[in-house]
Amino acid sequence: MQDYKMPTREQNSNKGTFGKVLNFAGCKNYIGASYLSTVSTLKVGAGFVALASEKEVIHSISTLLPEAVYLSREEGLRNVKQFSVFLIGCGLGVKHASIKFFKDILKQLQKETSPVVIDADGLNILAKHPIKLPQNSIITPHPLEAARLLGVSLQDVLNNLESSAKELAEKYDCVAVLKTHRTIICDKEKLFINQHGNSALAKAGSGDVLAGIIAGLLAQKMPTFEAAKLGVYLHSRTGEIASQELSEYSVLASDLPIYLHKAIKEIL
């Protein structure tokens, strides 16, 4: 734990000091992903978070999370210059409209230097519709998503986890977070293997929480590799802490933002 350190929080500050995140997430079939990713971004310390999504999604979660700002997808796309970090893909869906929208977002962000986290359906779309990623991108695939991104079999990835992570970082010119029991974080020069976590994290929605945590750390001006490394640690350690009270069987993804502060306090 001594190797991990949270970003500094100056007392002479305001919400803008700790970054503005725009989260393109959710569709009517995957409403929960937008909530989990957004609340996690706030819980790790981002100063301002906006969710750009469909009307059904916003209607469902806006009363659950009044701290966030809510925009339509189109409003989000028009206002990218107001934000410092972007999270794309959690529950976005893979229908034609989502595919077109994903391409439009990336084309817009290629003009920017702000960090971008791509997760879940964003990765599924990227695998089928390759497009150059913006500078300072982080991708967060599980092994099956990694296999699609690399054009290989799932077994190939499982048999070669470290080399697969390196290949992802090289192919997409990004930081790759290959999510496994011992998640691998790497870029073109560095590789780190996380040693925390348990089966409590093997639940739907857990990856949305991780993506949100990483985006929130980026908002506080952490470099991409360090934000990914710390985000993976906090996520996995939170799973361990929550399991002590709830058991590995009963921890839900929605429990992770609730227990996140305990993992943070351990390294302050």
Regions found by a protein language model. Name each.
Residues M1-V117, N124-I138, A147-L268:
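Small-residue (G/A/S/T)-rich helix-start motifs and N-terminal tracts that mark the onset
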